[in-house]
Amino acid sequence: MNVLWLQSAGCGGCTMSLLCAESPNVLDLLAGAGIRFLWHPALSVESGAEVRALLAAIEAGDVALDVLCIEGSIATGPRGTGRYQILSGTGVPMLDWLRRLAPLAGDVVAVGTCATYGGITTAGGNPSEAVGVQ
């Protein structure tokens, strides 16, 4: 099962909690279940051009995307553009990546409170106009 994990606006706490699992070790558990991370920002060694090529291959249909995991809230500001949160190296807002990749995924999983409800990023007047994945 091919899984792409994107981290949007948030602290990465869900990933850190996942990595602290000891019995069983989360990486061994996932591998044993046939789960293959296409990319995870904290677990994968690929970056830059390699990640951009992977995203292009997913969009072209050359790489199957079974599950798209989103960690963190989605910054929609300013004024609905999503430009407050750009996926590094792509020049494309995370909001747009979500819109482009979600229809290609078999399932979309909002990981944690930030991704599901907006989390702490929505506090204090919500200047980034953050929302949950809904």
Regions found by a protein language model. Name each.
Residues M1-Q134:
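Iron-sulfur-associated redox domains of electron-transfer enzymes in respiratory
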